[in-house]
Amino acid sequence: MMRALLLAIGLGLVAALQAQEFPAVGQPLQDLLGRWYLKAMTSDPEIPGKKPESVTPLILKALEGGDLEAQITFLIDGQCQDVTLVLKKTNQPFTFTAYDGKRVVYILPSKVKDHYILYCEGELDGQEVRMAKLVGRDPENNPEALEEFKEVARAKGLNPDIVRPQQSETCSPGGN
């Protein structure tokens, strides 16, 4: 059950959505690489298990052929859980698959500079799950980006219970 929770959370961190708008094909993938901070998250249905107590920055790296690697660490139930996920490039810009094609990952820009709304759809333990995450280049909360995230979540019929995990540069069981 914990593995399924970690897989679901990890996948949700590397997907994005914004009112069905895709970035221009020419927008460089380079813009996505580097350090991102998870600012908010939600899913439908709600993923069973505990929500992360804190998260480290998400690191996106380029792999050969246009694939991406995402790395992040969560503190869940007092335990540090490292997640590394490979996103396989598709024929659509800023659209990837994960877990042998079982999940589709969209990476789309927010209207707010240096923010993305991450979105994914796919199967988890035999059930269809949709997740959205708000990430930004700095750890500070941005009310405009959060409001846009809430609007997108509402429009997609996601759980209105928005989780805002604590930011942490490193994972420390028993403290942040």
Swiss-Prot record:
<protein>
    <recommendedName>
        <fullName>Lipocalin-1</fullName>
    </recommendedName>
</protein>
<comment type="function">
    <text>Could play a role in taste reception. Could be necessary for the concentration and delivery of sapid molecules in the gustatory system. Can bind various ligands, with chemical structures ranging from lipids and retinoids to the macrocyclic antibiotic rifampicin and even to microbial siderophores. Exhibits an extremely wide ligand pocket.</text>
</comment>
<dbReference type="GO" id="GO:0005615">
    <property type="term" value="C:extracellular space"/>
</dbReference>
<keyword id="KW-0813">Transport</keyword>
<feature type="signal peptide">
    <location>
        <begin position="1"/>
        <end position="19"/>
    </location>
</feature>
<dbReference type="InterPro" id="IPR012674">
    <property type="entry name" value="Calycin"/>
</dbReference>
<dbReference type="GO" id="GO:0050909">
    <property type="term" value="P:sensory perception of taste"/>
</dbReference>
<keyword id="KW-0919">Taste</keyword>
<dbReference type="GO" id="GO:0036094">
    <property type="term" value="F:small molecule binding"/>
</dbReference>
<keyword id="KW-0716">Sensory transduction</keyword>
<feature type="disulfide bond">
    <location>
        <begin position="80"/>
        <end position="171"/>
    </location>
</feature>
<comment type="subunit">
    <text>Predominantly monomer. May form homodimer. Interacts with LMBR1L; this interaction mediates the endocytosis of LCN1.</text>
</comment>
<dbReference type="InterPro" id="IPR000566">
    <property type="entry name" value="Lipocln_cytosolic_FA-bd_dom"/>
</dbReference>
<comment type="similarity">
    <text>Belongs to the calycin superfamily. Lipocalin family.</text>
</comment>
<keyword id="KW-0964">Secreted</keyword>
<keyword id="KW-1015">Disulfide bond</keyword>
<dbReference type="InterPro" id="IPR002345">
    <property type="entry name" value="Lipocalin"/>
</dbReference>
<dbReference type="InterPro" id="IPR002450">
    <property type="entry name" value="von_Ebner_gland"/>
</dbReference>
<keyword id="KW-0732">Signal</keyword>
<dbReference type="Pfam" id="PF00061">
    <property type="entry name" value="Lipocalin"/>
</dbReference>
